[in-house]
Amino acid sequence: MNDTDKKFPLQPVYDTGFDDGYLQRDYEKCLESAAANDAQTVELQTQLLAEIKNLENEIKALKAQESRQPDPHNNARIQSLEASLNRLVNEYNNFEFQKNYMVDRVAELNNKARFFKDELKRLQQENAAFVNSRYANWADFQSNYQLKLDQFQALIDQQNQTIKQLNEQIAANQGLIDQNVQRLQQNHSLDQQERDALLYEVDHLYNELYELENQKRLVGIEYEATYQDLVSADAELQNVYETIAQNQANFQKQCDAYWAQLKQVEQQIQTTKQELVDEESTLKVRLNDADFYINSRLAELDDLTSKINERDFVSKEQAQDVKASLANLTKEKERLSAEKDSFERLRNTALNDINRMEQENALFAKHLEQQQYEFERKQQESLLKLETEHKQLQKRIGEFKIESEAKSEALLIQERELLEKRREIDDLLTQASLEYEQQRRTNQVLKEKHRQVQQHFQNLVHAKKKLDQKRHYLAEQKRIDEEQIFKLKEKIATERRELEKLYLVKKQKQDQKENDLLIFEKQLRQYQADFENEIEEKQNELFASQKSLQKSFTQLKNKEAELNQKAQKIAEDWAHLKQNKHHHADLEIFLEGEFNHLQQEKHKLLEARTQFDNRVSLLSARFKQKQAELVKQKQSLEQLTAAFNKEQEAVERDWKDRLANLEKQKEMLGDKVHQFDENSLNISKKLAERELAIKFKEKELEAAQKQLSLDNNNNAGLKLQLDKLSESLKTERLELEASKERILDFYDESSRRIADYESDLQARLAEVKTLEKNQQETAAKSERELKVALEKLNQAKKAFLQIRKQQLLEIASVKQQLAQKANLLKNQQAELDKQTEELEAAFLEQDTDKKELEKALHSVKSKQELLERERSFLLQKQREFAEHVAGFKRQVHFKTTQMQRLSEFNKQQQSEQIKRETELKIAFADLKKDYQLFELQKNQEFQQIEQKHKELELLAQKQAELKQELEQKATALASQDQDTVQAKLDLARQQHELELRQNAFNQASLSLNKQREQLTNQVKVLHGELKKRHEKLTLKDRLLAEKEKDQHKKDAEINQRFKQFENEYADFDQAKKRELQELNQIRRNLEQSNASLLKKRNQLTLDFALLRKVQHNTQTNRVQLNTQIKEFLLEKKNFQKASDEAALQKALLIKRLRSFASKLQLQREALAIQKLEFDKRDEQQKSEINNAKLQLEQFKLEKQNFDEAKQKQLIEFKDQCQRLDVEKRLLKQKLVQLKNLSKSYLTYKNRADLSQQQLQHKYANLLELKEKLQTAKRALDKKHRAIYGKMAQFVSELRQEKKQLLSAQKQVDDKSRLLEQNQRHLQNLSSETKKKRQSLEHDINKFDQRRKEAVSSILNSHKKLKQKEGELQGILQKLSLKKTQIEQEFSKLYQQREKLDRQRTTLSKLHRELKAQNEATAHKNREVLEIENYYKKELQRLTTEKSEFDNNKNRLFEYFRKIRNEIEKKEAHIKTVLEETQKKRHLVETEAVKLHLQKQSIISKGQELKEIKERVSRDISHTNKQREELNSLLHQNKLLQKNLAEREREINNKDSLLTQKIQTAKQKLSEKEARILKLLEKMRAVEQQYQAEITRLKTRNADLEKNDNKHLFPPLFKINGNDMNYPYPYPWFYPQQKQEDSSNQIRHLFEQQLQFMQQRYENELTELRRQRALLEKKLDQIQLESQLSAKKNDFEKVEQMMQKLLEKTEQKLSAFDQKINALAEQINTQKAEHADSEKQQLLLRIEQLEKQNLAQAVQTPQPVQPVVQAPAVVPQVIQPQVVQSQPAFLATQQSISKQQQIAQLNAEINSIKKLIAQKAAK
């Protein structure tokens, strides 16, 4: 056992736990052992060099001895030593070559091992960093999540506390209310003041209770917000789970990739093992050669010893020489055995190195598995932690839900109790609300009518949308049909020129439109600026008018104050007069006059107040007019913005149309390139065919020349014809070389173009990256601006809500004050009633004093003054209330303007987003261009690979030619003397080395072919991945488009809600104005009643004065006074009634205001909920947009990685090419060496006969040409099969990808329809909620119950929405799963059997869909099912026939191979037989002269020849039998072809019937579509008339767009039948969309007028859809039939190829039979001609030899020592031609001594005897 044979232990690795230091030490030990092995190999090399030097020295010494003393033994020894030296030199060279190769191989493997170790270290580091980062992020996430949970818990606790406090306060207030109500009901002895006070307290407590309930609702909303935050936290946890799963999947993918690389390294190690085995085989061959050489030398020695023993001519010196030669031979044998041992050591060391590498790889794999196991364990632990935390969260959420439900139930119970108490309170007020109920009923009737009208309007809108959808669907279907039916008919050049001209015209018009748009934008801006200036001026005017009103109001207040002061003075004077009764009555009269004067001034003030009120009403009317004007201006602005948007959309459509044109041009260029590639392939095929024809002609010429050389009696005319043919062939060959040079020039130009394209691609990629960066920056800016705007909006909304709350509280406080003042008035009226009763008692008693009367009058006057003050205070409050309302209006107007600006800002952002989307689409188009260029590059690279393959084939041909030359040299050397045996052996060795090199070269070419196949497979895989990514991007584009549509719909809903809010605000203003008018009327009535009271008071004063004057008169005046008092009391009662009516109206007003406030709060809550929903949707859309961007970036990164991998592969391929070039150079150098060696042997060629050389050369050429033909034919067959197989695979893959794309499109359409249905369902739910709100407004008595129902319905709707969102998420997950399934199916498409199975499954799916769709039309379903069943049967039959055909084909191929192998064997046998016959004939011709006694051997040879003839005849009969079998198989194949043709005819007949049916159906459809188009034209004409009446601008723009469409969109864009060359990548690029958009806008304006016309055409549209569905089904059937026909065409091509191959094989067999017959005829003729001549020549030769022997024996009687040279039996190629009569050795007979001549003759006789004995033994 050597040190290298020891195996390294594996146990310490597991004991130490896979220590890296231990591995390094182990690796160093392995390196040391390898170094020791290298040292041993170096020592072996030195030994070989020493042996070579020793041999050279021996040769020199022997040559020196020969120069001094010539000796024949020395010559033989020198030759043997030279041969051994050459052999050792060759072995040394081979050894160095193998050593270098193994060193390079080991270095490569070491580099790979180092690379993988570095990669492992990097992976470990990345894994550690990844785990640390993920766990760090996870810890942060856990801490953040715990903080959030704590915050949520704290918020929940706070909210619970606040709810408890509010409940306590509500309970306390309710208790107080109940107490006060009980006191009012039970204590009837309470005074009016106490009752009023209790009622006031009850009202105050009721208001507080209302406020507390509002606070409670707000807390509930916050409670829901916290719950939603908890749900979002749960969603974040789920996202974390998903990210962990994704990271785990990515790590698994990386591990799988490295495992695959390790497997590749193991495969490389196995290949090196195989190479070592091959080298061992070569060494064995060499050892066998050496053994053969030694055995041959031993045989020679045995011959010598036998001859010495037989004749006793050998002396002792010769015996010593023989012993010395034997010793040398044994030494050489030992040396060879030592070399064998050294080579075996090398092999063992290499095997040990390989085992060591395998062990290291195994350890490496185990380490990887351990790391993977640890990582998976850590991941599982983290996942378990996350799952436990997730479960805890879910538990907390459940507990929170239970608590929230319990709290909600408690709240509901409390609310029920409150409702019961409120009902009790409301029952007290039901009597006063009868009139209000009547008004409410009338309002309900009106609202129901309004609701019915709205429902009718919504139904009409819904029907209109359905009709629009149907029409859009029909238009799309029509477009698809037109694109599928029509094809491009005009030429490319003319179309391109026309497109360029149209593009210039369109560009000019577009520039004009852009200028017009700029002007229009400037005008809009100016108009907006003017409008804002007008608004500011009007606001200034309003402020000025307010200031003037305030001034007048202050003046009135001052005047009232002065009047009050005067009244006070008069009252003081009156009191002074009462004290001083003795004053004169004149003063009383004076005071009465002043009192009257004051009353007149008071009347004037009242008139001024009425004027002031009139002025206020005028100002309010003007304000209303200005407000209406502003609304009109706003509407005009909206119309202008809509027109601007329309023009912008038209510009975008034009741009999209331009993009579509450019894409179409690109596709046309791609078609041109494809045609160019096909033409180049056809040209190359034609050139190859011409080369083959020329080769065949050359072979025919060579055959003709051979016939000329054989037949000396041919005519000279044939020579001339052959010369002409050779000249024509030369010219054709020159033309071929010129064409080849042109092709090479073309490929050089194409490579240069590829380089230019690559540079352009890189530049474009850089531009795309910059564009993406700019887009990202702009998107970030826009998102920031949006966030800022949304924050401002939220702040403004919050401020608005606060202001609104404050104003509502102020209104409530004003109402309370009014109620207090009303109560005070009631109290004062009660006091007045008491005083009047006292006065009546005083007047009745007649004994009361004047003092009491005067006191009563004084108290009445003071109370009247108090009443006037209170009235003035009330007026002030009313004015303040009006001012508050005006300020509130201003704020609302300001907020509405802000909302309008925000809506405009949103529109601008939407336009910017649309622009960005167009830029993205342009980028996608550029990516498509790049993809096409990549395909072109790929094709060109494949062409380059094919070129290199051809070059390799040329090199192989050159090597074959060199081999032919060497074989020629060998044949020439074989015809030389027997002394050149060693040279022949050297040539045989060189030939063997060349064969080994050729094998290595073939292996290199095979490895290149494998690499080429791998490259093609990789390119196919990448091609599929690019297609998948392209499909994903298209799907994402569609999803983005759908999301944009949803966003537009949401914006429209928001605008509708704002409009509803404005309408509600207007209704609120109207109701408020009505209530203010009612209050003003009440105030006027009160003023009138006050005026009447004042008049009556004046009359009473006058009556009292008269009473003073007429106290002493009779009681007649008293009767009048009593009557007046009674009238006063009646008026007082009427006043009380009026005051009661006012109180009732006040209560009604309070109720109305409360109901309105509750409605406003409900609307506010609904708006808040909707706002939350919209915010969530916006966040979802943002996240989806970010995901799309991330996916785009990933796609770009993957593309970069793909480009880098492609470049690396190209670099590797170039490196391999360089290596091949180096190998070529080495081969050339060795060929040069061989040529130099061959020059040394040229001297021997001159001695050979020219005739034999020519014949041998021609025969060798024939054989080589035959072999070349066979190899070329096999290569061509292989290439054709590979090409056709690849083409068939590519076509089938394309078709299946088309089908799968169509199925995926259908699935996406179905999903989009489901999404639209869900959106409609959501809209229906929103409409139902609106109806419920309206129903809540109808019933005020059942308001609370309905409120609960509304809340429950809203919660249910939210739950449903969440459920639907979950369903949508599930659908999206299903879509993602389906995507993954589709990707997996794409990866499995490369196997043909699975392809056939999938085609069958797709057919079955199509049949099922056809069955599901055609249930409505049963009769047509039956027809379709019959057709489908027929196609199924035919498909099954075709598959069975295909399998039978493939089996027959395989059998034929196997049979052909067997026949070829048998033919080759027979040819080789015939060659050997011919060679043996030729050798025998030559030997008989040379030896028959010497031997008369051995005529029987000649007779035996004749018998052997007869046996050979019989064998040949048997072989010929056997070949005839095989030919008959071949003919029978061909006949069977023809019968199968006939059956296939008959079945194809049947299928074609059925296809024609189907096409006729489809054409009839299409005609009917076209007629119906023409009718509908006429009706649509009529509708469009009507719409255009209305449009002309409404706006002139729209008509101008529409006319311009129509003219542009006529100029810019000729019917060329509608004519396209190919699915692959689809001109419009997106449906909104289609030019017909403009007309549809304009018609949709017109329909929105005139829905009511177009409803009846649309209802007429619904039935016809449904029929069209049904018929179109039938047409689509039939078209699908036609596509299936086209696929079947394509497959049949492929089968026909394969059959044609088979027929061609069979014909070629028949031709070859016939030619081969002809050649065999010709050879047999030649042999028979030669035998017949030379049968007699051979005998005569042999007798003559024997006589001559005997004479020479006798003559020489007489001259030299002593015995002669013959120089024996044993003839080596070497397989020589000897041609069937008669050797000339004069032998070769007679030419040098004079220079040789007589003894030598005798020895030679004896040697020849002995050799002939031996040969005869050997053949007799055989």
Curated annotation (Swiss-Prot):
<protein>
    <recommendedName>
        <fullName>Cytadherence high molecular weight protein 2</fullName>
    </recommendedName>
</protein>
<feature type="coiled-coil region">
    <location>
        <begin position="1644"/>
        <end position="1755"/>
    </location>
</feature>
<keyword id="KW-0843">Virulence</keyword>
<comment type="function">
    <text>Component of the cytoskeleton-like structure which stabilizes the shape of the wall-less Mycoplasma. This cytoskeleton-like network of accessory proteins containing HMW proteins 1 to 5 allows the proper anchoring of cytadhesin proteins in the mycoplasmal membrane at the attachment organelle.</text>
</comment>
<dbReference type="GO" id="GO:0020035">
    <property type="term" value="P:adhesion of symbiont to microvasculature"/>
</dbReference>
<dbReference type="InterPro" id="IPR016430">
    <property type="entry name" value="Cytadherence_Hmw2"/>
</dbReference>
<keyword id="KW-0200">Cytadherence</keyword>
<feature type="coiled-coil region">
    <location>
        <begin position="1786"/>
        <end position="1817"/>
    </location>
</feature>
<keyword id="KW-0597">Phosphoprotein</keyword>
<keyword id="KW-0175">Coiled coil</keyword>
<feature type="coiled-coil region">
    <location>
        <begin position="31"/>
        <end position="880"/>
    </location>
</feature>
<feature type="coiled-coil region">
    <location>
        <begin position="919"/>
        <end position="1607"/>
    </location>
</feature>
